[in-house]
């Protein structure tokens, strides 16, 4: 491990990528700690302490999960990666509905660039909407309930517009930084920024668990997190290897092919994307309800307000757990269906003279791949759902339903381990290309 790390730093190109990624991460954390103009930061800090200790503490922890604590502090990067994630969900859903998007997806790199451009435009529009909602909630006292202090001292139109523009610009900058990491650094940029935001909150949340619940609960939570980490690493490395044989063929005077290889199908083919999508989607009803309440100035008594307040504001509630679990299952199947097309894989294999032993090329191969993929996706989706909701159940039973520290939850652990493994594998492939021994044995 140490020798591989030293080798990665000795390689000029790889060292440049690692240092570039670290530089972007540092800038991201600086922006996440920099208050927006017009925000009374000491009052914000005091309100966060009061709100986190109240009944809404759990949903506040969930909201802060993807921003590293920046959202509730109303910093420059308060909106963070959420607009881009939401835009990605919408664009990928539209590929099933709009034929033009489906055609772009099949056009390769050029089509993907166009889809990315549409995602950026939609992300900026969503950033404006989300920043406006956050500022409106903060101005009306609905963002941090139970706090009477003024978060925004000067509530003139000019000040509010400036804060919205700053947060929107921050979201655009975060999106650009994530794409820079993907293009010039190591790992997936957006996923890595989410990873950094979660990791930044672990020390403070660990101290909070230790002080509020004592050493026994803290040890139990750490042990549960360790067990989850081991299980996640084990499953993430698991794959079904489908043997592929390539027939010999003559090209000029040379013989090509005749080799045997395999097509790896991971148990968790979708990665952490379904968890990120489900986590970002499940808090939207709460945010919309808070915005409506702050706009009307009264607490709603409709069935929707009661449903959101009772079930969707408490991550340890059984209804919340069931909806969250169902969303993960849905997004797992949906994302796998988009990223892995059995028909395209079968056509590619047939084009280059490849076939699965015992299976005819073409349609039978596609049907076989679809059958195997469906059998793998079911346990993979259940695995993601169970790991994500297991700490919710554990803390509900063991801690009497008190506030959940989400950086130690299954969602955060899944994202951190998934992103960490993906980043290590990218460094591993870079080292192996240069004939160095990698991290993974």
From Swiss-Prot:
Annotated PROSITE patterns: SECY_1, SECY_2
Transmembrane segments: 18-38, 78-98, 124-144, 157-177, 180-200, 215-235, 272-292, 318-338, 382-402, 403-423
Lipid bilayer topology: Multi-pass membrane protein
Keyword Disulfide bond: no
Predominant subcellular localization, coarse grouping: membrane
Gene3D superfamilies on file: SecY subunit domain
InterPro entries in the cross-refs: SecY, SecY/SEC61-alpha, SecY_CS, SecY_dom_sf
UniProt keyword terms in alphabetical order: Cell membrane, Membrane, Protein transport, Translocation, Transmembrane, Transmembrane helix, Transport
GO-annotated cellular components: cell envelope Sec protein transport complex; extracellular region; plasma membrane
UniProt record, GO biological process: protein transport by the Sec complex; SRP-dependent cotranslational protein targeting to membrane, translocation
Compartment annotation: Cell membrane
GO molecular-function terms, A-Z: protein transmembrane transporter activity; signal sequence binding
Family annotation (PANTHER family): SECY/SEC61-ALPHA FAMILY MEMBER
NCBIfam families attached to this UniProt entry: 3a0501s007 (TIGR00967)
Role description: The central subunit of the protein translocation channel SecYEG. Consists of two halves formed by TMs 1-5 and 6-10. These two domains form a lateral gate at the front which open onto the bilayer between TMs 2 and 7, and are clamped together by SecE at the back. The channel is closed by both a pore ring composed of hydrophobic SecY resides and a short helix (helix 2A) on the extracellular side of the membrane which forms a plug. The plug probably moves laterally to allow the channel to open. The ring and the pore may move independently.
Binding partners and assembly: Component of the Sec protein translocase complex. Heterotrimer consisting of SecY, SecE and SecG subunits. The heterotrimers can form oligomers, although 1 heterotrimer is thought to be able to translocate proteins. Interacts with the ribosome. Interacts with SecDF, and other proteins may be involved. Interacts with SecA.
Miscellaneous note of the record: Was identified as a high-confidence drug target.
Family to which the UniProt record says this protein belongs: Belongs to the SecY/SEC61-alpha family.
Protein name: Protein translocase subunit SecY
Organism: Mycobacterium tuberculosis (strain ATCC 25618 / H37Rv)
């Amino acid at each position: 491990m140490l020798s591989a790390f030293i080798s990665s730093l000795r390689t000029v190109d790889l060292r440049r990528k690692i240092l570039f990624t670290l530089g972007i991460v540092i800038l991201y954390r600086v922006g996440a700690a920099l208050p927006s103009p017009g925000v009374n930061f000491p009052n914000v800090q005091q309100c966060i302490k009061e709100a986190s200790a109240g009944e809404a503490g759990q949903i506040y922890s969930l909201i802060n999960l993807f921003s590293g604590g920046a959202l509730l502090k109303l910093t420059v990067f308060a909106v963070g990666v959420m607009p881009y994630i939401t835009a990605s969900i919408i664009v990928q859903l539209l590929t099933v509905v709009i034929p033009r998007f489906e055609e772009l997806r099949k056009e390769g790199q050029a089509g993907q660039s166009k889809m990315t451009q549409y995602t950026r435009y939609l992300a900026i529009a969503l950033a404006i909407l989300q920043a406006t909602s956050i500022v409106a909630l903060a101005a009306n006292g609905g963002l941090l309930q139970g706090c009477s202090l003024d978060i925004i001292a000067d509530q003139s139109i000019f000040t509010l517009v400036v804060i919205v523009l700053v947060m929107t610009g921050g979201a655009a900058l975060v999106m650009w930084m994530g794409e820079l990491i993907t293009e010039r650094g190591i790992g997936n940029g957006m996923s890595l920024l989410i990873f950094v935001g979660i990791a930044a909150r672990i020390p403070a949340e660990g101290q909070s668990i230790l002080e509020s619940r004592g050493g026994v609960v803290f040890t139990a939570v750490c042990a549960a997190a360790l067990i989850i980490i081991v299980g996640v690493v084990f499953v993430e490395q698991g794959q079904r290897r489908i043997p592929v044989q390539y027939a010999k063929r003559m090209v000029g005077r040379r013989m090509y092919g005749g080799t045997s290889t395999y097509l790896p199908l991971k148990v968790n083919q979708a990665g952490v994307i379904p968890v990120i999508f489900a986590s970002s989607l499940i808090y939207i009803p709460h945010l919309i309800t808070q915005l409506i309440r702050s706009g009307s100035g009264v607490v709603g008594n409709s069935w929707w307000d009661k449903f959101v307040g009772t079930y969707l504001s408490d991550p340890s509630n059984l209804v919340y757990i069931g909806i969250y679990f169902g969303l993960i299952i849905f997004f797992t199947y949906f994302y796998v269906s988009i990223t892995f097309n059995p028909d395209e894989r079968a056509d590619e294999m047939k084009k280059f003279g490849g076939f699965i032993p015992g299976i005819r090329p073409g349609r039978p191969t596609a049907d076989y791949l679809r059958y195997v993929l469906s059998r793998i996706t079911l346990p993979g989706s259940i695995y993601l759902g169970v790991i994500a909701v297991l700490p919710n159940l554990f803390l509900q039973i063991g801690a009497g339903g008190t506030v959940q520290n989400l950086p130690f939850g299954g969602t955060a652990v899944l994202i951190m381990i998934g992103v960490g493994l993906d980043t290590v594998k990218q460094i591993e492939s870079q080292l192996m290309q240069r004939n160095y021994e990698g991290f993974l044995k």
